[in-house]
Amino acid sequence: MTELAQMKCEACQADAPKVTDDELAQLIAKIPDWGVEVRDGIMQLERVYKFKNFKLAMAFTNKLADLAEADFHHPGILTEWGKVTVTWWSHSIKGLHKNDFIMAAKTDTLLD
């Protein structure tokens, strides 16, 4: 388990700072399977997880739902046959916060 996966999310208000370019470089290096996407001007973390069938993809999605509820931080999730696309960003600040990197790392632990 990575250092990030062991951290707790903090409450993120609309005036919370987005990660800086330096923080982004440091944090993304800790979750190398994730990429940064920009949609409608909003920076987001995204990863596609592959599975052997829909049932396994759905089981992963349900584990992720439990994780998101426990941490009060919710991703975009697209569940399809054989894959789940997970997108993390902080809605309140319309961008990336350290919480998103923490949750991405925690999402990776669901495969263990």
Curated annotation (Swiss-Prot):
Which keywords does the record carry? Answer: Lyase
Q: Which reaction does it catalyse?
A: (4aS,6R)-4a-hydroxy-L-erythro-5,6,7,8-tetrahydrobiopterin = (6R)-L-erythro-6,7-dihydrobiopterin + H2O
**Signal peptide start and end residues:** none
Highest rank taxon of the organism: Bacteria
Is the keyword Lyase assigned to this protein? yes
Sorted alphabetically, which InterPro entries does this protein's record hold?
PCD_sf, Pterin-4-alpha-carb_dehyd, Pterin_deHydtase
Q: Name one GO biological process term.
A: tetrahydrobiopterin biosynthetic process
Query: A single GO molecular function, which one?
Result: 4-alpha-hydroxytetrahydrobiopterin dehydratase activity
Uppermost EC category:
lyase
> What Pfam families does the record tag this protein with?
Pterin_4a
This enzyme's EC code(s):
4.2.1.96
Q: Which SUPFAM superfamilies match?
A: PCD-like (SSF55248)
Question: In which family does this protein belong, per the annotation?
Answer: Belongs to the pterin-4-alpha-carbinolamine dehydratase family.
What is the protein's name according to its record?
Putative pterin-4-alpha-carbinolamine dehydratase
What organism is this sequence from?
Shewanella halifaxensis (strain HAW-EB4)
